[in-house]
């Protein structure tokens, strides 16, 4: 999968590269990303390490891809399948501020999920997000992930408080 490249309308999902680090540093400092996906990246060396961790798929438990604009190659965000084990996985994503509200995350999640079902033979992919993160709920719904329930106070987010989370999932057998 080292040379994996997926496409979705207007997007290319590709492996992370060292040159992505400068954009990652700027985007992960965005308050909306820090609120829901605090990464602790505060300087360029940390951003380079962050990119290298995501580019290293050797454990077999995750596949992380950069989301780029198909027209100009600009970095628009990231998406990953992680916790891959026994036919199950979780999916996560983030989008750059300039890419929000354009369906980037939904298109990426749909493409990466289809690849996971087809190429990895996954049966179930889960997606969870803070109940207050309405944008992520829309991504889940638009990508065919069904709401299964609420995980009470299940995760501490960037604000330091525990939040309830929505649990969504898609099965390979779902339409």
Where in this protein do the model-derived segments appear?
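Conserved acetyl-CoA-binding loop-helix of GNAT-fold acetyltransferases
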Residues: 94-95, 101-118, 134-142
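Glycine-centered small-residue hotspots that permit tight backbone geometry or close packing
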Residues: 61-64, 80, 103, 108, ...
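Conserved phosphate-binding and hydrolysis motifs of nucleotide-dependent enzymes
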Residues: 77, 133, 144
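GNAT-family acyltransferases
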Residues: 1-98, 119, 161-175
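Conserved catalytic-core motifs of GNAT/GCN5-like acyltransferases
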Residues: 16, 126-128, 146-163
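Conserved active-site tyrosine of GNAT-family acetyltransferases
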Residues: 140, 145, 168
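Short, basic (Lys/Arg/His-rich) helix/loop patches that form interaction surfaces
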Residues: 118, 124-127
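Conserved beta-strand edge residues that scaffold enzyme active sites
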Residues: 42, 65, 130-131, 154
